[in-house]
Amino acid sequence: MSAIVGLCLLSEKVVLSRSLTDEVSKLYKLNRGNVKEPRKYATERMSTQSKPVALQVPVSTIVLDYKDEDFIKQNPTYSAMDIIGSPSNTAPQTAFQSIMPSLSALFNTPFIQGAFRHRIISSMGPEISYLVMVIGPPSGFMDTPNVSSAQSSVHTVSNADVDLNDIIAINSTMAKSTKLVSASTLQAMLVNDVYDRCMDLDGILLSQALPFFRNYVNVQSKGSLPPAVAACLNTPIKELFSMGSGKREPLTLEFRKDNEGQCLGIVLPKGHEGDTLSSRYPAVFINESEPFSDKERSELSELKRTDSDAYEKLYSETISKHVSDGSYGNRVIISHKMSRLSNGGVKIIGRFKISDFNTVKKNLSSRSGEVDSAKEQWEALSGNGLVTDSNISMLHDKILDTITSNKPGVVLRDGNKKSENIVVCFKNGFPNKKHSLLQLTKNGISVVSLDELTDAGILVESTGPDRVRRSPKALANKLSSFKGRKVTLDVDNMSTEALIQKLSAL
């Protein structure tokens, strides 16, 4: 399924005054498995009044707009921004476009926007998903008003020009600038709170989006927008599909098989312990020269001594040859130079280096003859999109985050551990306030919804009276017919490490 989804990270509890559309209900069912049927009526207590509402959504996400695959196929020249909307658009056409400029004007601060795109090549063909999330306001909030009326409610911390203690003024501003004034309850947050709040969101959706978005929030909070993100947002949907190894041709939406997908690679100079990554995660990473034959290595070694330009040309051609014959498989290629990957037909998904070259020199203390070439490679990496860190372990973590963002479903497990993926479903919902879904994913544990659970997976039921949740009839039937393994765990009183250890031992 291809989908573009507009998400707002605004409150722990969202009360909508309208029913979910069929498309949005379908989206929640696919990813959560616990969509509540719209109630005919309900009330939300605010101050001394009760406000009528139509539905309570049991997650901290507002789905303001959702476009499915059919819509995308019918409008292949639309970009994500065309579909979801620009925050500067004063004449909005969709719910998402409508509410964001209004909130930005109301709070007198920019709302941080991020877009995450992941592309999956499957037996069913290319699939593309967008998560467009909004976090704001990002900083400088002091007052904590609680404003309510029959038309709107806002609980936020802000330094807005509007006097947030003046209920009449705030309601007047909301009514004038916000077309969806009664659509949601809003709660602002600081950038430092992004990570914790993200973990409270839809776990299945965010397990891939979080690493990218976390970095994007940090960059955007410093006042710069990565060109790649801007380009991604404004590229026609049909041009986001490319075919074949080494080709970048725009396509319309059509099907193809797994083994026809483009190889992915990262650039990591010498002295950055690339061998550690490939040995620890052999199913995920492969060094650029690993498939080379003895004859190829000998030819390259001879050229390296006599003609450096010819050496680099042959190196790229050798990589291209092994890309074409499938020697790299579905693994991410680690290369010391960008040119080797790009000339070899490999898609570069990240460039990484240690911020201080002295650290690289220490790592090469036993290989002093390689320091000069390592420095040349290190200095060649610069510009937008370069990821750096002063610590090698932290840099490797950032690499892993990039891999999970670009290769959804990848299992990051140590090489000495069993390679099969562990699929689990938490009957009462993933305990995201207590545990990190990202850590489970990195340890080879995939958390799925009840709809996606097969008899080969594990059903986890959480203890405690507060973990009881009523299931819709369809999901109740799924539970009764489940023949796989079941386990009861006190997940609320376990550390994430203990939970991972327990699930891995099952």
Swiss-Prot record:
Main localization category: virion
Location(s) in or outside the cell: Virion; Host cytoplasm
Region feature RNA-binding, mapped onto this chain: 128-249, 325-355
One Pfam family named in its UniProt record: Phytoreo_S7
GO function terms (MF aspect): RNA binding
Superkingdom of origin organism: Viruses
Keyword RNA-binding: yes
Keywords (A to Z) from UniProt: Capsid protein, Host cytoplasm, RNA-binding, Virion
GO cellular component, one term: viral capsid
Family: Belongs to the phytoreovirus protein P7 family.
The protein's role, per its UniProt record: Probable component of the transcriptional machinery present in the inner capsid. Displays dsRNA binding activity and may play an important role in the sorting of viral RNA and virion assembly. Together with the RNA-directed RNA polymerase P1 and capping enzyme P5, forms an transcriptional complex positioned near the channels situated at each of the five-fold vertices of the core.
Protein name (database record): Protein P7
Organism whose genome encodes this protein: Rice dwarf virus (isolate Akita)
Lineage: Viruses, Riboviria, Orthornavirae, Duplornaviricota, Resentoviricetes
